[in-house]
Amino acid sequence: MEFHESSPFVFITRGFIFIAISIAVLRRIISKKTKTLPPGPWKLPLIGNLHQFLGSVPYQILRDLAQKNGPLMHLQLGEVSAIVAASPQMAKEITKTLDLQFADRPVIQALRIVTYDYLDISFNAYGKYWRQLRKIFVQELLTSKRVRSFCSIREDEFSNLVKTINSANGKSINLSKLMTSCTNSIINKVAFGKVRYEREVFIDLINQILALAGGFKLVDLFPSYKILHVLEGTERKLWEIRGKIDKILDKVIDEHRENSSRTGKGNGCNGQEDIVDILLRIEEGGDLDLDIPFGNNNIKALLFDIIAGGTETSSTAVDWAMSEMMRNPHVMSKAQKEIREAFNGKEKIEENDIQNLKYLKLVIQETLRLHPPAPLLMRQCREKCEIGGYHIPVGTKAFINVWAIGRDPAYWPNPESFIPERFDDNTYEFTKSEHHAFEYLPFGAGRRMCPGISFGLANVELPLALLLYHFNWQLPDGSTTLDMTEATGLAARRKYDLQLIATSYA
């Protein structure tokens, strides 16, 4: 039997085929739509959205882009696919609902070198080793008891800071540099105790690393272009710096071992353990029953985290708190009144004296809302998942714009104003409880939340209390305005150092 082109059978058959194909195509389109990436700004060939970040503060640009593209948007940063969360709901999805799926950190080549191939806690991939490191920090290095044991170091160093400011005799001082130096000294004594080493050289090397690792680097954005490692020149410099740091830290560790073997005591104040002592005890078996390799390189990687992370975050927070109070003198007056009434002429101020300074704590909370230590939290997707119906592939970088969330008028009335009283009802916490809103994330959330909150706050509360108790403050040259420009980069630092004049409070 033959069927002609015009026969009803051929027509019906073709119709069925057309319908079947149409249904298949429609299903693929619908399926594809349900697995699309979040919306985002238009992208250029090869570089994607990189052109939109030139010369700008990244988290500010991301806030502006989110206002046009939504609270979850997609960016193409060279070869890197990234999503950006700019609302509490999206932040909660990444750090709580899908916390395990986003438990990794992005690969940063500069930090791979100086952390001994990610042996540190900050950038090590989530897994057994990382969980053991978290255990070390939570149960040994940064317990509340351990942080309190270092209080004499903080009290001595901040007392010296007051003396240094007094010696300026009313001349302009660079408070930013003084705070950084003071905090550096505290962190190094906490870590290394009484062991002598090339402190200034070591601090300079750490600062060089932070400068080389900051911002978006071509080697991270175009990982398949290996020649960029050579052209950018960063890798060679970092290996040179790591070699110098190795020599310093190996000597410090050897001296700790020798002292412990000889005296049976720690290298800290009054024979107590410093951070290196604790890590060496853990290496030798300790009390934690670890099931991971743990040697010199592991110790050095963790020391890098503590020193690099602890110094900048605390000193920057004090910098911004003083800056905001200079712009809001009524806040400074209220804080000074509380402190001076509480201390009532007391000459030596100790950490125990500041525990009930409620308004000072509100000032710090408000400072961290406007100027979070890590304005962009970085995660990486390790298991494919969906957020709001959007498909997120494995390897996608995730940025949580903490800076933008803390300034969103939908959650914060008068968000650009410095109003410590907004925290008076204890609605917001540094740690996230089960039902807590995610509008406030100065230390992150979830598995990757900062383990050093109490240590960091201790290095902010006491110096602020002392600065406000002992001195009255004014801007140099009779200025009435203060430049609050933020530095270009991923950290929330002031672009210009804070210069102030202090007069002793009689």
Curated annotation (Swiss-Prot):
| E.C. designation(s) | 1.14.14.50
Membrane disposition:
Single-pass membrane protein
Q: Name one GO cellular component term.
A: endoplasmic reticulum membrane
Q: What induces it?
A: Up-regulated by herbivory.
- Segments on the Lumenal face: 1-5
Positions with a binding annotation for heme = 450
Taken from the record's topology, the Cytoplasmic segments are: 27-506
Q: Which family does it belong to?
A: Belongs to the cytochrome P450 family.
Q: What is this protein called?
A: Tabersonine 3-oxygenase
